[in-house]
Structure formats: structure tokens, C-alpha cells
Amino acid sequence: SIYHVWKILMIKRLVNFTVVYFLLLSISFGTQKYCKSCKGELTGQYLIHKGNNYHRSCYDKHIQIYCDHCNRKIEASYNTSKGKNYHKRCFQQHIQKRCDECGDLINGIYNVHEGKEYHESCYVNHILPKCDICYQPVEDKYIKDFWGNYYHHYHEDKIPSCDNCNRLISKQLTKGGFSVSANRFVCNLCKPNVVKTKSQLNKNLAEVLNVFKKIGINELPERIPVTLVDSKDDLIKMSGHRHGNIQGYTSYEESTLAGKIIDQDYHIYILSNLHEEIFNAVLAHELLHVYLFQNQIDLKSDFREGFCNLGSSLIYENYSSKLSKYRLKNMNENTDPDYGIGFRKMKSMLDKIGWKRLLKKLPRL
């Protein structure tokens, strides 16, 4: 998923208006003077403020500024904030914003995140998420993957992803990885569980057939040939399929005599170095193609691929691991008309009527 970092949710500038009041003590000689406030005659000592004359009592009552924190007179420069006045010391100690990270006063631009306020530098260095690949703060577009890793969006253009878990293959995220072919890579987290040799295939085939027997699919061939293919391009050419995400393919040949099928041959091809859970899910998908061939059930492409994807879904649900949950999430979010939308149509039908009735209903779809 691509996000824009909550870089600066709010930027504010503290503006301290400092006004210096000079209280001038003056004695009148000669010219008669009057108080600006009460209009009474001034005799003896009086105060001059901004060119106007005041009795001391009138000045204290009407002109004198008081601190809105301690309620004492302000006799020198002061700070204002949100229409209130403060001694400089009162403002710094009780009113002025402090960084919620370092605790120091905030005097300029600051960042607000989740109701807390930070110096710009504190926000960047301590609050912003750090890229799990380059460890730098993420201040622009970033990816948060299924596994909880954060990284800059641009790393996706430079670093290959694992063919199984889709993590970016790097020392930091996957402890490295290896290439299977020109366009296929596997990370070292998935490596211990991949299917890459013929000796593994019989075990995997038996496991999947056993899962199918539990839902009433009992007549699938138990010795069907399965071949591993390294290159996805080779698999695409072999199948004549244009779907770029292809992971398996089943070839089917039949022999007929007098219009009747007397023999059927199947051969399944699956990408090598798939994680065992994914390999079994792909194998289940291909075996359901065999089921359709066996029973001469010809479905529209969305029902056909959607039905076969029910096999993959069944395998992932049996594992219930985080990897299988990730693959199920992708299946449920896939927008492809056949493999995504078609799958969800068939899954909805399966959830309503169950496997037994669905298998009976297939020929009529």
C-alpha cells in the first residue's frame, strides 16, 4: 500500500509581540494638565504613557497591564499569546510551547502529530517512521507491506521482490536471497521451505490429494506427472497463456475411438522454488483443472478459473499461516475477471451450498 507520510499535520509559528512600556514620572510646572482617563486636573506627580497624562490611580485602574498568569503588574517588556499578556518569565515557564520529545521551548515552526507538538528536527529524527531498508526518515511516499515493513516508495523500483512473500529482497528485510531465473527471485526467509527437486513432488501430491478426499473429490490420478519449471516466461510460452502471474499449467490430451474417450493424459507444470504452501495451492488449482477434464465439464473462463482457485483457497485455509493469509488476501483483492472476480463468485456459491452440492451443480453452470 502506498501512503503519504503524516509529515507535517500542522505548522504554526509562535509570534511573541514584545511591547516596552516606559513609565515616566513627571512634575508639572506652569501649564495646566488634565488626566486623559478621568479628565480631572493633574497636580503634583503624574504618569505619561504614549503621550497622554494620567493620575497614578487612573493609570493603575485603566491602563496598567497585568499578567494573565500571575495577575501581577507588568512594568517592562512582555509577551502576548492568544489575546493574553504575560511577564516574559511567566510566559516561558508556563505558557510557551515545549517539545513533547526533548522538553525544550519551541520558538519557531513546529510539527503537530497525534495531538503532540515537536521541534521540526525532533519530529524528523524521532517521530517519523524510519525506512527499514536505508534507515533514513520517511518524509514522502512510503510503502507499508503486509509484514509490517516501512520503506521509501522508490526502493521498489530498484530492489527485486520475493516470488513467494513479495518482500523486497535485501539484507535488512530478508537476509538476502537468490535468483531462480532472469525475472524470478526468492528471499532467504522463504528459501528453507521451497519445492525445487523431483524427490519432493510425490509427498506434495499426496498431501493435496488427501485434502481433496476430505471434501469428496476422490477420483483424481494419484501418479499424475508434475514437472518443475524455473522460468515464468517458459511457462507462459508452454501454456499459451498471457496472464503474467501464471504459476502453473496443466496439459491435457485425450484419445478417442468411435467418438468415445478411451484414454486421457495429463501433465502438470509448476514454477520451481515456490514456498511449499504456495506450491501445494498451485498444485490444487491444477488438479481441479484435471477434475474438470475428467468429468468433461466445460465452464466459462470465470467459473472455470474461479472454481480451480477454490482448491488454492482450501489449501491456504488448511495452513492458516501468515504466508497463507497473505496469499488469501491477494486472492480476495484480485481484480482479474477470472482469477479474482470469478473466484469470489465461486467462493460465495461454495459458502452457501458447500462442496457436495457445488460439485453436483458444476455441469449446469
Language-model features, listed with the residues they occupy:
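Pan-zinc metallopeptidase signature
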Residues: 128, 132, 156-174, 178, ...
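Active-site recognition of the HExxH zinc-binding catalytic motif
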Residues: 212, 281-295, 305-309, 313
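Classical Sec-dependent N-terminal signal peptides that target proteins to the secretory pathway
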Residues: 3-30
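Auxiliary, metal-adjacent structural segments of Zn-dependent hydrolase domains
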Residues: 197-266
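Post-HExxH zinc-binding segment in Zn-dependent metallohydrolases
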Residues: 297-339
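Hydrophobic (often cysteine-bearing) scaffold residues that line and stabilize catalytic clefts
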Residues: 16, 127, 201-204, 279-280, ...
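Short pre-active-site segment immediately N-terminal to the catalytic Zn-binding motif
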Residues: 262-283, 295-300
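N-terminal low-structure segments adjacent to metalloprotease catalytic domains
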Residues: 30-210, 214
